[in-house]
Structure formats: structure tokens, C-alpha cells
Amino acid sequence: DFTDPKKDIWEFLKSYIEGYDCAVFSAPAFSRPLEIRQVLISPSIGPLSDKNKELSDERISSVCERFKINRERPIITQISRFDYLKDPVGVIKAYKMVKEHVDCQLVLAGGGATDDPEGMKVLDDVRREAENDPDIFVLFLPPASDVEINALQRASSIVLQKSLREGFGLTVAEALWKEKPVI
């Protein structure tokens, strides 16, 4: 975690890392002095992957129908794991403020490890905050849901990414690739 690096952990890992020919980092700020070559590979999306390729309008509608999302009304979407750092409860609170002015729907879609007790607690908190609003769709998706995520983003009027600590997530790049406004 770059926001709070642990020097003792780095020193422990360094001896293992230097046993390789090269170390790959996603940003220059993450690299550290090493005796081996370092390479920068910035995070990116795959435009031809299932998560980002063009989809037919019929396919997008099919996914929305499966989840009972009405494409005729504005859709606000956040794609992320169910994690407190993604602030899904804060997203619901923001949606409720918007809902006072615009008849819209909210989709919170993502996954997480089923063996992560905190992730399941977050999901429970989100479901509790969303209950009694039929226009909030909390979708806990399996790992192989790239087409569904793609369709949900393409059906969206606006995509949110309310991460509390992440500077710029790939879901932002994916939504922008699909020409969706991102907040």
C-alpha cells in the first residue's frame, strides 16, 4: 500500500525480488532501489476483452432484463468489490439525494471473496441500506461476469467510482472507453 509503505515488509521481500532478472512496477513511485533491472508497466484495459468489447443493444438489454433493470430510466452504476474503501453505502446515500430530483436507478455490481468476512459484512451493510428501495440493484457477481459488467456499464447514464483511497481505478478507464461520464 503506497499510502502507508511498510519498510520492514519491503526489506523482507527485497531479498526474494532480487533473485529474479527483473522487477515490474505499475508506477515510478512504487519502485525502490534494487540490484536488478526495473520495468514500468502502467495498468491498462483490454479494449477487445469481454469486459470492454462492443456489445449489441440486444445483449445489453438481455443483461438488464435478467436483473430487472429498466433501460428506459436513468441508471447510475458503480462497479467495484464490496469493500468499505469503495464506499458503497456512501454511494447509496448520494443516489438518494439525486433521486429527490431525478427518477433514476442505482446499480452496485461487483464481487469479492466469499471467504472474506469483512467483504460479506460490507455486502450485508449495503443490502440493509438499500432495502425498501426497488430501484437499487445490489448485484454480487461471480468472477466470470465480464460481459455482464460490460453491459451494465454500457446501459448506464453515469458511472460512479467513489473509492476513498484509490487514485484512479481501471473501472474508470473502462467506463470512459465506453464513452460514459464518470463521477
Labelled PLM ranges:
Residues 164:
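Aromatic "clamp/platform" in nucleotide-sugar-dependent glycosyltransferases that forms part
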Residues 157, 179:
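A short alpha->beta transition loop at the rim of the catalytic pocket in nucleotide-sugar-dependent
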Residues 65-86, 92, 106-107:
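Conserved donor-binding/catalytic core segment of Leloir-type glycosyltransferases
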Residues 181-183:
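Short hydrophobic beta-strand element within catalytic cores of glycosyltransferases
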Residues 53-75, 99-102:
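Nucleotide-sugar donor-binding and catalytic loop/hinge architecture
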Residues 3-64:
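A short, active-site helix/loop in glycosyltransferases that binds the activated sugar's phosphate group
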Residues 110-151:
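Nucleotide-activated donor-binding/catalytic signature segment of Leloir-type glycosyltransferases, i.e.
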Residues 169-172:
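Short glycine/serine-rich donor-binding loops of glycosyltransferases
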